[in-house]
């Protein structure tokens, strides 16, 4: 059984399902590699116009695989004993983790098309970070969220310390990291962590309907919106206005923009191609 399922749908939505239900989709090495490969394929494939990410079974993602962590720690210790310079071992392990971050959370956050996390259950630790990387979070009423890192004596990874404060504020983010409190779907909606809460049995249906609506839209413009929004997270207003002006003019020259103008004049709905 593969750790990640991948489906390209006729409506332009790619559905990626984390598929280790017996462990609440905890992140094995294989899962991280496959997820990164499928996200890269989605980014390259123009036929994919929206990406949906969910989990099989009762959980979205329970974060890192603790058994795998123990094995890696043992291997790291052995490698450290074999090498004269333990800093080299740390550098290698750090670089490997960074590659995992780039292939997953960063790609979800930056790819030039909408990404939607359909959170069906628990999303904690790196699993929380992963769903925060998506543009939009639609969650089951049974979803639960937490940072969890304190419980295993770790500081956090997969971009959570960057993304969480931008959604819930720095004070609440610090509290969530320091306490590892688990919050339910209603609380997550209240504090701005998620966008929508739906009935558990309707999550996939309603989530994919939402994704299909995005996929039928001007996805090239969505990509430029994301570029502006991401740039604005760290830029000055002056710099962002330059960026907006440039991308606005580029968007105005696009096939989709010209189609939208024609459709308006002809009193019909536009048929966007994502270009």
Residue ranges and their predicted role:
Residues 1-56, 70:
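Conserved CoA-thioester-binding segment of acyl-CoA-metabolizing enzymes
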Residues 16, 20, 34-35, 53, ...:
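Terminal peptide-recognition signature
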Residues 30-34, 100, 107, 206, ...:
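Charged catalytic carboxylate motif
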Residues 55-107, 153:
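Glycine- (often His-adjacent) and acidic-residue-rich active-site loop
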Residues 93, 151, 233, 247:
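Localized chelating/binding microdomains
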Residues 106-222, 249-262, 268, 275:
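Crotonase-fold acyl-CoA enzyme core
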Residues 226-235:
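Short, charged, surface-exposed hinge/linker loops at domain edges
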């Amino acid at each position: 059984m593969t750790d990640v399922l991948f489906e390209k749908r006729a409506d332009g939505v790619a559905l990626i399902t984390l598929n280790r239900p017996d462990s609440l989709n905890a992140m094995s090495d294989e899962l991280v590699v496959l997820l990164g490969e499928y996200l890269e394929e989605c980014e390259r494939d123009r036929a994919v116009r929206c990406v949906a990410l969910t989990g099989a079974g009762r959980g979205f993602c329970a974060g890192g695989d603790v058994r795998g962590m123990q094995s890696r720690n043992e291997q790291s210790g052995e490698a450290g004993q074999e090498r004269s310079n333990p800093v080299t071992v740390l550098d290698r392990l750090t670089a490997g983790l960074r590659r995992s971050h780039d292939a997953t959370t960063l790609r979800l956050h930056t790819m030039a098309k909408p990404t939607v996390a359909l959170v069906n259950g628990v999303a904690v630790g790196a699993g929380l970070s992963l769903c925060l990387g998506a543009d939009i979070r639609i969650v089951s009423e049974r979803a639960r969220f937490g940072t969890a890192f304190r419980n295993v004596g770790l500081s956090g990874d997969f971009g959570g310390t960057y993304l969480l404060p931008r959604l819930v504020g720095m004070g609440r983010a610090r509290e969530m990291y320091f306490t590892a409190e688990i919050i339910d779907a209603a609380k997550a909606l209240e504090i701005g962590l998620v966008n929508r809460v739906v009935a558990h049995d309707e999550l996939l249906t309603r989530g994919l309907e939402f994704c299909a609506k995005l996929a039928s839209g001007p996805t090239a413009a969505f990509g430029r919106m994301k570029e502006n929004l991401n740039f604005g997270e760290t830029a000055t207003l002056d710099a962002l206005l330059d960026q907006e002006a440039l991308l606005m003019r580029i968007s105005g020259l696009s096939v989709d923009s010209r189609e939208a103008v024609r459709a308006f004049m002809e009193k019909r709905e536009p048929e966007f191609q994502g270009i």
